Regions:
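A metal-dependent, Asp-based hydrolase signature
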Residues: 44, 64-101
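Asp-based, Mg2+/Mn2+-dependent phosphohydrolase catalytic module
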Residues: 3, 8, 121, 133, ...
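An amphipathic alpha-helix signature
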Residues: 38, 53, 57, 77, ...
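Active-site neighborhood of HAD-like aspartate-dependent phosphohydrolases
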Residues: 17-61
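Short, acidic loop-to-helix structural element flanking the phosphoryl-transfer center
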Residues: 77-78, 95-132, 142
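Non-catalytic pre-domain segments flanking phosphatase-related domains
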Residues: 1-25
Length: 242
């Protein structure tokens, strides 16, 4: 698809035609590369770096869903650590306290995707209001934003921690309209996670799916309003709707 944007069928006319006034970004996988932790994992466990990063992310997300459905909240930091412990057990790795600490600390300084900083600066220069809306708890988000040199670009770091649940619970998505004092269709919700884009679309956002991996759309009876391959494609989408 490249820079061409796919406006999808099956959305409300309001979401399709709304003037965009703000953007809410998912953090992990969208702004920050969760698989970049695999580089350190490879050094600590040679030959296992990719497997660790893949399974760790899978369990991290699975645990947020299970805890949200069951009302058993733990912070995203704790859930991330639990996912790492499971991953080590599943792969038969000796996860010492020092290695666990090193990998967890790396999660606070994940690599940003290469185009992201320039895109964020472009949007800010266009007068677009921006915030992060994430499963991450506040200390994690603050550390990641600082490490990625994104400080000063966002009005707010909106965390699920205040409602003690996780995406795709509707209460989480309500943070965007509540913060910006805008209707959901006036806000572009940006995520690289197809399930997150689906949840935000159900809520009523104008959704933009950053489909970096070229995955098919989740089969949930709903599609994101638009799709691009990188965050660079978002700029064109927002410009056309301001």
């Amino acid at each position: 698809m490249g820079a061409a944007l796919a406006a999808s069928a099956g959305h409300s006319a309001l979401a399709q035609g709304a003037k965009i006034k703000a953007v809410a970004f998912d953090a992990y996988g969208t702004l920050f590369d969760v698989y970049s932790v695999g580089q350190l994992a490879e050094k600590l466990f040679p030959g296992q770096g990719n497997a660790i990063s893949q399974l760790w992310r899978t369990k991290q997300i699975e645990y947020t869903w299970l805890r949200a459905m069951s009302g058993q909240y733990r912070t995203f930091w704790e859930v991330t650590e639990d996912g790492l412990v499971f991953t080590a057990q599943r792969l038969g790795l000796d996860l010492t306290d020092d290695k666990k600490r090193a990998l967890m600390e790396q999660y606070n300084k994940l690599d940003p995707f290469p185009e992201n900083l320039e895109v964020l600066k472009q949007l800010k220069g266009m007068g677009v209001r921006m915030a992060i809306l994430s499963n991450g708890n506040p200390p994690m988000l603050e550390a990641a934003v600082k490490s990625a040199r994104m400080e000063g670009l966002f009005e707010a770091l909106l965390s699920v921690d205040s409602v003690k649940s996780f995406k795709t619970v509707p209460e989480v998505y309500r943070f965007g309209p509540d913060h910006f004092k805008l209707s959901a269709p006036e806000i572009v919700f940006v995520s690289s996670n197809g399930w997150d884009a689906a949840g935000a679309t159900w809520f009523g956002y104008t959704t933009f799916w950053v489909n970096r991996a070229g995955n098919p759309t989740e089969v949930l009876g709903v599609r994101p309003v638009a799709e691009g391959k990188t965050l660079t494609d978002l700029v064109e989408f927002v410009k056309a709707r301001m």
